[in-house]
């Protein structure tokens, strides 16, 4: 069997990967999507082709011999997007790290290098495979040289393989005659002119009959059609030049040796480190852990598995100033802990023998208590004030010269809230949460792992990731099979939490987010922990009854839809529904896709007012989702105590909003009555009621304050109906004569402006023309002139700094503002306009939550904060405490921020969430 060489067209495959994948970036903001896609294509092709040799060819910026022949060669090509351009040196660096032979040649294109190497290898008796997205390379196909062309159809990439015979079958000409076709028809991609009036069909007929442009020219008078004959007569010199431009040079003077091209071990340590830097976690699984960890496992860890040693270890930790802690848990079970006394003394404490879960968690709890106690004593001794409540003020962790104090005792962890599930503490100043700090410093990341933190904040330190230590094993499986890896994992987490504290604190200070961290996010950990532990009670019988109501209505809708359709069909099948609506019933406005008609909500919503069947289908979908998500889905979420304990996430959204999962209680429907009724299943325990407090139009009030628009501020100060006021101003009608429709439209504009809505978006929301929507927005900005300047200023600030900030200093990076892609850039501008407003509103609700939680606790009340949904707080309130809790909610929510317009709170009470809302 012949040896094989795989030849890769570097720029072509990189380009395909760039446009075929989402725009990926790593935590440093470096674009990586094209490199990631290239590597996946490369590795997959190697697995399929199994070559002995590999070479990747790239173009250079310098002009080639073709530019000397024709100055306008490739002159119509658009410049390479900057996001792609910056990845070219990156892929070359990666290939070099993998030991891949990379070849370039000044004056020649990658095609010429590939053609030369293909012919050279064929002459040596080898098989050659060329991978490229460029069909020009088909001219190189022979029985020994195969061209592989990736082709994307309906989002899926397949590969077309061409030897000489496949070229003939597809194009009716031999591979060398591909050049003749280009000579006649030209190539718009490369700006090869060809001859006027001859397209692919005519060119193919001519070459099939005459074989070459020279032979066709010799039989000029016989050429058909007439237009082609006259064009050949007048432009034969252009055809000859086009042929020369299209011909791939197969004897380029390049330096090449098969020794350098020999395919060796691609998974080198250098490649591993680069993959880590670029955050290609899926690719890291391909590397041999033992080989790549030689230089990364520098840290020495100790195991403490006896009671006496454990006592001594915790005594030492309590005597010290700072400790890093990690707890290894799964499904509520504790397997062990990592404890870093400093950056050299790091211990793993397994739960075994006399060291029980209760003992270990008790020692960690004691450590936190000791830290709190010590800090309190130091504060009293130094006669300093307690931490100030106002997030806009300086705090006691800062010296007068602006530097941070590090003399305070502290326990550091990657996720303090996860720690609090197993130990009790209520002192935010006793802990440092590296995960929350990392989120504040870069809120665009989807996860915050210890190895990422080490790389970013510990001078590029490379630590093995969890996957490298444990693979895909569960903690329990690792406990049984990979005890050493589990110990290392626990120690690395504890070490990273401790080591990252100082650089992260400095970064928070330098970015102006120290107060956001200490005054908002750090206390919030304890607030959310309390909410998760309390949970919210669910009435199972009511939930069952709700599900039955939904089932009845869904059944009624099903029959109505079938009756209107004239037949039974699967309403949950978009394909079947599309045929019924747009073919059988002949509804206008159908949008055909490759798989059938689109039945997306935005399509159907436009048709609903005119067609009752569509209105019924939309209701059917909404109710079916309600049933599966809530009526059925919530049943499995009810714990043994009869309550649902949702998880509240503070490190997910880029704007700073809190989200909830397992289950998501923030998406409880509010627009339709049957959706709102789900709130009836959430009830307080006996002797309690729900108090629900909701900020009124908080984002519009924030907009008024931040923009300083006098007219909007005055409207709020006069307690006017803000939407009616806007309608009156925008539509030039007296306040008392504003119609309901005008008020609804003004409301859409008011809230749309907050979210940076475009005229197109507003036209879709209001079912009006884009021109009308643009006029509404223009009139709005004429009414409130400072808002336009404020929003434009935010976009400019985002472009200049790369981020925008909330009123309290929270940053929101916006890399999209620098994108060469118009859609991405437009998205970035909308983000720049709405993030400071949304983010400030999110900060305010968090401050309010912290204040309410602390007041309830400090005043020893039985009532507790159990839920937060956007701008709404729900308190499970002891009936005897209703007046006191109402006053606390009113005072703390209104006092959470000082705005030029007063914050307003709507408050209701009820025996279930539905009644309270």
Residue map of PLM features:
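Extended two-metal-dependent nuclease catalytic cores across DNA- and RNA-processing enzymes
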Residues: 2, 22-26, 75-254
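Conserved "right-hand" nucleotidyltransferase catalytic core of DNA-directed polymerases
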Residues: 235-354, 388, 394, 399-410, ...
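Domain-level signal for Mg2+-assisted phosphodiester chemistry and nucleotide/NA-binding surfaces
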Residues: 1-101, 816-819
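Active-site-proximal helix-loop-helix substrate-binding element of RNase H-like nuclease domains
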Residues: 154-182, 301, 335-376, 381-510, ...
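C-terminal polymerase-core module
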Residues: 552-559, 563-615, 782-830, 834, ...
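Function-dense linear segments that define catalytic or interfacial modules
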Residues: 339-343, 441-472, 489-496, 650-735
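Active-site palm subdomain of RNA-directed nucleic acid polymerases
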Residues: 508-520, 524, 844, 848-869, ...
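Conserved catalytic core of nucleic-acid polymerases
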Residues: 476-479, 533, 641, 645-646, ...
């Amino acid at each position: 069997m012949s040896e094989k060489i795989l030849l890769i067209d570097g720029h072509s495959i990189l380009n395909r990967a760039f446009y075929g994948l989402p725009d990926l970036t790593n935590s440093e903001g470096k674009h990586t999507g094209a490199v990631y896609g290239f590597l996946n294509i490369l590795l997959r092709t190697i697995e399929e082709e199994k070559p002995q040799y590999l070479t990747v060819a790239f173009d250079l910026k310098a002009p080639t011999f073709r530019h000397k022949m024709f100055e306008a060669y490739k002159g119509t090509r658009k410049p390479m997007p900057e996001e792609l351009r910056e990845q070219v040196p990156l892929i070359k660096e990666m290939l070099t790290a993998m030991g891949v032979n990379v070849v370039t040649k000044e004056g020649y294109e990658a095609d010429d290098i590939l053609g030369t190497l293909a012919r050279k290898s064929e002459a040596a008796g080898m098989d050659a495979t060329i991978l490229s997205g460029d069909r020009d390379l088909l001219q190189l196909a022979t029985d020994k040289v195969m061209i592989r062309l990736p082709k994307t159809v309906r989002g899926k990439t397949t590969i077309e393989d061409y030897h000489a015979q496949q070229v003939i079958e597809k194009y009716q000409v031999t591979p060398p005659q591909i050049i003749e076709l280009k000579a006649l028809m030209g190539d718009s991609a490369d700006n090869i002119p060809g001859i006027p009036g001859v397209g692919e069909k005519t060119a193919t007929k001519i070459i099939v009959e005459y074989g070459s442009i020279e032979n066709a020219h010799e039989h000029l008078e016989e050429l058909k059609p007439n237009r082609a004959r006259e064009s050949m007569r007048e432009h034969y010199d252009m055809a000859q030049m086009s042929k020369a431009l299209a011909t791939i040079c197969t004897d380029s003077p390049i330096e090449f040796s098969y020794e350098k091209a020999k395919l060796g071990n691609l998974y080198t340590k250098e490649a591993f480190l680069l993959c880590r830097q670029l955050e290609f976690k899926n690719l890291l699984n391909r590397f041999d852990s033992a080989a790549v960890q030689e230089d990364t496992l520098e840290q020495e860890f100790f195991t403490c598995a006896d009671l006496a040693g454990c006592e001594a270890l915790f005594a030492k930790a309590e005597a010290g100033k700072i400790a890093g802690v990690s707890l290894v848990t799964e499904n509520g079970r504790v397997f062990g802990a990592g404890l870093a006394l400093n950056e050299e003394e790091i211990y793993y404490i397994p739960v075994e023998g006399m060291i029980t879960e209760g003992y270990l968690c008790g020692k960690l709890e004691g450590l936190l208590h000791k830290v709190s106690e010590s800090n309190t004593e130091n504060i009293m001794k130094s006669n300093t004030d307690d931490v100030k409540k106002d997030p806009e003020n300086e705090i006691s962790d800062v010296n007068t010269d602006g530097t941070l104090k590090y003399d305070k005792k502290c326990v550091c962890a990657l996720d303090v809230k996860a720690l609090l599930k197993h130990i009790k503490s209520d002192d935010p100043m006793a802990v440092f949460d590296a995960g929350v700090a990392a989120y504040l410093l870069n809120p665009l990341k989807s996860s915050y792992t210890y190895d990422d933190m080490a790389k970013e904040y510990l001078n590029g330190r490379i630590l093995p990731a969890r996957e490298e230590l444990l693979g895909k094993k569960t903690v329990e499986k690792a406990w049984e099979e990979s005890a050493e890896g589990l110990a290392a994992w626990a120690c690395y987490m504890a070490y990273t939490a401790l080591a990252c504290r100082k650089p992260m604190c400095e970064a928070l200070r330098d970015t102006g987010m120290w107060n956001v961290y200490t005054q908002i996010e750090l206390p919030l950990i304890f607030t959310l922990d309390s909410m998760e532990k309390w949970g919210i009670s669910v009435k199972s019988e009511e939930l069952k009854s709700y599900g039955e109501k939904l089932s009845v209505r869904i059944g009624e809708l099903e029959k109505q839809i079938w009756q209107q359709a004239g037949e039974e069909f699967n309403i949950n099948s978009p394909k079947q529904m599309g045929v019924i609506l747009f073919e059988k019933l002949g509804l206008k406005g159908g949008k055909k896709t490759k798989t059938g008609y689109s039945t997306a909500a935005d399509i159907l919503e436009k048709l609903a007012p005119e067609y009752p069947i569509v209105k019924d289908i939309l209701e059917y979908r909404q109710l079916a989702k309600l049933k599966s998500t809530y009526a059925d889905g919530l049943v499995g979420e009810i714990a043994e105590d009869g309550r649902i304990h949702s998880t509240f996430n503070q490190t997910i959204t880029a704007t700073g909003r809190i989200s909830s999962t397992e289950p998501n209680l923030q998406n409880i429907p509010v627009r339709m009555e049957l959706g709102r009724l789900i709130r009836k299943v959430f009830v307080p325990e006996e002797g309690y009621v729900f108090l629900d407090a909701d900020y009124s139009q908080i984002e519009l009030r924030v907009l008024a304050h931040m923009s300083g628009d006098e007219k909007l501020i005055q409207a709020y100060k006069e307690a006017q109906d803000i939407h009616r006021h806007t309608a009156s101003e925008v539509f030039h009608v007296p306040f008392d004569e504003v119609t309901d429709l005008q008020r609804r439209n003004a409301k859409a504009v008011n809230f749309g402006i907050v979210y940076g809505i475009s005229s197109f978006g507003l036209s879709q929301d209001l079912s009006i023309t884009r021109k009308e929507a643009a006029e509404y927005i223009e009139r709005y900005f004429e009414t409130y002139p400072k808002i336009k300047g404020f929003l434009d200023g935010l976009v400019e600030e985002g472009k200049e700094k790369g981020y925008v900030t909330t009123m309290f200093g929270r940053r929101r990076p916006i890399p999209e503002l620098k994108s060469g892609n118009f859609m991405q850039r437009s998205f970035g501008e909308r983000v720049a306009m709405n993030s400071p407003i949304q983010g400030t509103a999110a900060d305010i609700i968090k401050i309010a939550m912290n204040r309410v939680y602390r007041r309830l606790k400090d005043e020893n009340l039985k009532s507790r904060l159990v839920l937060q949904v956007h701008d709404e707080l729900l308190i499970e309130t002891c009936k005897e405490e209703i007046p006191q809790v109402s006053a606390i909610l009113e005072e703390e929510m209104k006092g959470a921020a000082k705005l030029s317009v007063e914050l307003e709170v709507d408050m209701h009470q009820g025996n279930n969430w539905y009644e309270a809302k």
